[in-house]
Design a protein with these regions (language model features):
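Single conserved hydrophobic/aromatic residue that forms the stacking wall/gate
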Residues: 1-12
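EAL-family c-di-GMP phosphodiesterase catalytic domain
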Residues: 6, 20, 27-42, 54-158
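Short glycine/threonine-rich loop-to-helix capping motif typified by GTGT followed
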Residues: 10, 43-44
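Catalytic-core regions built around general acid/base machinery
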Residues: 13-17, 46-54
Length: 158
């Protein structure tokens, strides 16, 4: 059992820890890949639902790389859904990709889920996703991953 083997089973113990360290649950987010979530059982789904009820974020990563369908979204209590790079690589020129992304964005938003597109590298991709109503964008268009020390030097020090 994934929940028990990872020591995550007692959500309420986690709630006590959060209170002890005096942080807002909204500062915490669990991320699980689409494939892992699809393979997990009811206990894991219930675990994530309890986290969301506590105010903790739950994000599905790499949506579109597995075998789930949009219909599965109604079974999971998510706060964020990350559209996989593979679904938006040619979104600015591929009508099929555009329609798929639009369906994912529309359904997710109808369920109150924030939508993030991963792997955005071109302005045209960003513009198309913005037009479709995507909430957030991630990717090399804005910068490559950097070590914490470099991030601090570039963005936090004046």
């Amino acid at each position: 059992d994934l929940v028990r083997s990872r020591g995550l089973g007692d959500v309420y113990k986690r709630q006590d820890i959060i209170k002890q360290v005096d942080i807002s649950p909204t500062w915490i987010e669990f991320e699980i890949t689409e494939n892992s979530l699809m393979k997990s059982g009811k206990k894991m789904v219930d675990f994530f639902e309890k986290l969301v009820d506590m105010g903790i974020g739950v994000s599905m990563d790499d949506f579109g790389t597995g075998y789930s369908s949009l219909a599965y979204l109604k079974h999971f209590k998510l706060t964020k859904l990350k559209i996989a790079k593979e679904l938006i690589e040619s979104i600015e020129t591929d009508g099929t990709e555009t329609k798929i992304a639009e369906a994912v964005i529309t359904m997710s938003k109808a369920l109150g889920i924030t939508v993030i597109a991963e792997g955005v590298e071109k302005k045209e991709q960003r513009d198309k996703l913005k037009d479709l109503g995507c909430d957030q964008i991630q990717g090399f268009l804005y910068g490559k991953p950097v070590p914490a020390s470099e991030f601090e030097r570039k963005y936090l020090k004046k």
